[in-house]
Structure formats: structure tokens, C-alpha cells
């Protein structure tokens, strides 16, 4: 652990949004800064993981439309290329690249876009379980299933949409057209509200869910970048869409995913899925230090 540490919060102004980010700076560190990103998970979701890297400068942020980062039009969809521009600007303003990146879920998809557009920003990328439906062998039904989640949210609100999301993300194995056509479950099954608050700007279930999961990465640009990219898949989430996304992306890059302890959110203590934050962080460190 380095002897000096300072923490700052700042904002970047981008077309259509103001994006908030945090830097815990450790000037004496011998390591590159580590950026922890998700989508729609913001900075608060990485507090537990960040504690394991007290020898590095840590950069976290809230993606536009989530937590502290407001969009001018909350109903608009935001795709990975726009998130990549935001990430690039944050990296520049936080001191410049290259940085190491741990990216979770939709953040891993945004990180692939960052590597493609700004190849010198990232030294090592650990991309954990990108739910990239467009890259799956069953892309057609997978994309249809994501569209069904969004349709449920649009029609019935957050509780119904979240219940449908849980049903889909818990499913193991290839998806089918028949599964995509199934209605979502009763929200009460998952303790979700049955009422509709009328809001349709949720950063997970709103229009961005389609822009993120159906994204088509520039694979040639990703492969050409100097970034060392490691895909991660959870030992407890085998067969689930995001886990399968890690395998599909790794195949595109000519590699195999590294298995991580726990499930999709294995870096956080959870009562909902298997997790082992200490072992998870150790795996991230092993990759970054290799």
C-alpha cells in the first residue's frame, strides 16, 4: 500500500450528458491506474472490489444515465461507442492512459468499443461476462429475448420488466424463438412491485438495453489494438447469456475465457448468487500482474 492517497470527484461535460467520475490517487504506486467500469452499474458497485487494490490509483465512474451522471434526454438510448467516448474523456481528464481496466457486464461491451476507438487507452482489459447477444451462436433468439424484456418494461413498468430480466438472465443454454416468445413471470415471484410508476428511463431496462446487447463490435480494430484482453466467465454462471457472451467474444479474439469464482457479480458479496470477492479480486490481480 502506498503512503499517500487522495480522493477526488469530478465531472466531464459531453454532448448530451454530464458524467461524474471518482479518482482515488496513489502517487507512489508502481502500477498503472486501474479503472473499474460497469453498465449500468456505477462507481458504488465497485467499492468492495476497489478495496483489494489499495496499491493502485483507482478510477470509477457512473455511466451516463446512471446514478450521478445525468443525460439531457433520459429516454434516449446510449450505445457502446458513445460510452467509449465518455470513458476516453474520463481517462484523459484523470491523467491520461494507458490504464488497466476491469469491466463487468455491459461495461465489458463498452470497454471493447473503447479499445477499438482508442487503442492506446488500455494496457490490459479484463472483460467479465459481456452480455453480447449479437455475438452468440443463437444471436437471433437471444436478441429477440432482449427485445422482449424491453417490451415488457415498456408495457408494464419496472417490476414486470425486472422479473422478465431475471427469468432470461437465469436461463442456461442456447435460447430459442419459443423461449423468446414466453411472457415474463409474475413480478411477485421475485419480490418485485406489481404496480407501474410510469417511468421508462431505467438505465438497465430502458432503450439502452438494446443498444448495448445488440452492439456489433469492430472486431478487426479490437484485434489490432495493443491491449491485452482477457475474457472472464463465472464458475457459477455457466450457460447463462452473459457467461456465454464471454465465450463468444473470446472465440472472436482467438482465446479462451478465464474462469472466475462466483457468478455474474462474483466480485461483490451477494445473497442472490454465489460470490467470493476475495478470490475474485485475487484472480483479477493475477491477470494484471502477469
Predicted regions and their residues:
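Catalytic active-site module of serine/aspartate enzymes centered on a nucleophile-bearing elbow/loop
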Residues: 253-290
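Conserved donor sugar-nucleotide recognition element shared by glycan-biosynthetic enzymes
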Residues: 79-84, 107-108, 242
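Short beta-to-alpha linker loops that shape the active-site pocket of alpha/beta-hydrolase fold enzymes
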Residues: 62-66, 131, 263
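Active-site loop/oxyanion-hole signature of alpha/beta-hydrolase fold enzymes
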Residues: 65-100
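Conserved HGGG/HGGXW glycine-rich cap/lid loop of the alpha/beta-hydrolase fold
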Residues: 10-71, 76
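Conserved hydrolase catalytic core segment
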Residues: 97-137
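Alpha/beta-hydrolase
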Residues: 141, 145-148, 152-256
Amino acid at each position: 500500500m502506498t503512503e499517500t492517497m487522495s480522493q477526488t470527484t469530478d465531472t466531464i461535460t459531453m454532448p448530451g450528458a454530464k458524467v461524474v467520475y471518482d479518482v482515488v490517487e496513489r502517487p507512489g504506486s508502481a502500477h498503472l491506474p486501474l479503472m473499474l467500469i460497469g453498465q449500468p452499474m456505477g462507481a458504488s458497485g465497485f467499492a468492495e472490489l476497489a478495496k483489494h487494490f489499495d496499491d493502485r490509483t483507482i478510477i470509477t465512474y457512473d455511466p451516463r444515465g446512471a446514478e450521478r451522471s445525468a443525460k439531457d434526454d433520459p429516454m434516449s438510448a446510449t450505445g457502446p461507442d458513445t460510452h467509449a467516448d465518455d470513458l476516453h474523456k474520463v481517462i484523459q481528464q484523470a491523467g491520461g492512459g494507458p490504464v488497466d481496466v476491469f469491466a463487468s457486464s455491459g461495461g465489458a461491451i463498452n470497454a471493447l468499443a473503447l479499445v477499438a476507438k482508442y487503442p492506446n487507452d488500455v494496457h490490459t482489459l479484463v472483460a467479465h461476462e459481456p452480455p453480447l447477444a449479437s455475438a452468440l451462436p443463437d444471436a437471433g433468439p437471444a436478441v429477440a429475448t432482449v427485445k422482449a424484456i424491453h417490451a415488457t418494461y415498456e408495457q408494464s413498468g419496472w417490476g414486470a420488466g425486472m422479473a422478465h430480466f431475471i427469468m432470461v438472465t437465469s436461463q442456461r443454454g442456447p435460447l430459442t424463438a419459443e423461449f423468446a416468445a414466453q411472457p415474463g413471470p409474475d413480478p411477485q415471484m421475485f419480490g418485485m412491485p406489481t404496480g407501474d410508476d410510469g417511468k421508462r428511463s431505467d438505465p438497465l431496462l430502458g432503450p439502452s438495453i438494446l443498444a448495448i446487447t445488440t452492439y456489433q463490435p469492430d472486431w478487426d480494430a479490437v484485434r489490432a489494438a495493443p491491449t491485452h484482453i482477457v475474457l472472464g466467465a463465472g464458475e457459477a454462471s455457466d450457460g447463462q447469456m452473459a457467461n456465454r457472451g464471454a465465450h463468444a467474444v473470446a472465440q472472436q479474439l482467438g482465446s479462451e475465457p478465464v474462469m472466475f469464482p462466483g457468478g455474474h457479480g462474483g466480485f461483490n458479496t451477494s445473497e442472490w448468487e454465489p460470490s467470493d470477492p476475495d478470490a475474485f479480486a485475487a484472480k483479477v490481480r493475477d491477470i494484471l500482474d502477469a
